[in-house]
């Protein structure tokens, strides 16, 4: 079963309820923002910030045989790879990542 994301508006449409469901072995992530200030309080200019490849799982697709991918909504993941399709909804950045590019889940103890 796919996890579904219901959004109230897209940047290119007026208030409309939509369901976004990843197709195939893809995962929809809410992109984790880059740090703007260090823990010591030093501001990091945008030109010096490295892209943080972490996100929160919003929705997952399925394997070719229909079985669920071993991720669930809310999982914190680290991903790699060079290909990710970005979308922006209500000023929030979301990305579609291939499941094979998910490197790890982050579990806080």
From Swiss-Prot:
GO cellular component, one term: cytoplasm
Keyword Cytoplasm on entry: yes
CDD domains (UniProt xref): cpn10
Stated role: Together with the chaperonin GroEL, plays an essential role in assisting protein folding. The GroEL-GroES system forms a nano-cage that allows encapsulation of the non-native substrate proteins and provides a physical environment optimized to promote and accelerate protein folding. GroES binds to the apical surface of the GroEL ring, thereby capping the opening of the GroEL channel.
Domain of life: Archaea
Keywords, sorted A to Z: Chaperone, Cytoplasm
Predominant location category: cytoplasm
Quaternary assembly: Heptamer of 7 subunits arranged in a ring. Interacts with the chaperonin GroEL.
Record's keyword annotation contains Chaperone: yes
Subcellular location: Cytoplasm
Gene Ontology BP term (one): chaperone cofactor-dependent protein refolding
Name of the featured protein: Co-chaperonin GroES
Gene3D superfamilies assigned to the protein according to its UniProt record, in alphabetical order: GroES chaperonin
Listed HAMAP family: CH10
UniProt-listed PANTHER family: 10 KDA HEAT SHOCK PROTEIN, 20 KDA CHAPERONIN, CHLOROPLASTIC
GO molecular function, one term: ATP binding
Family (UniProt): Belongs to the GroES chaperonin family.
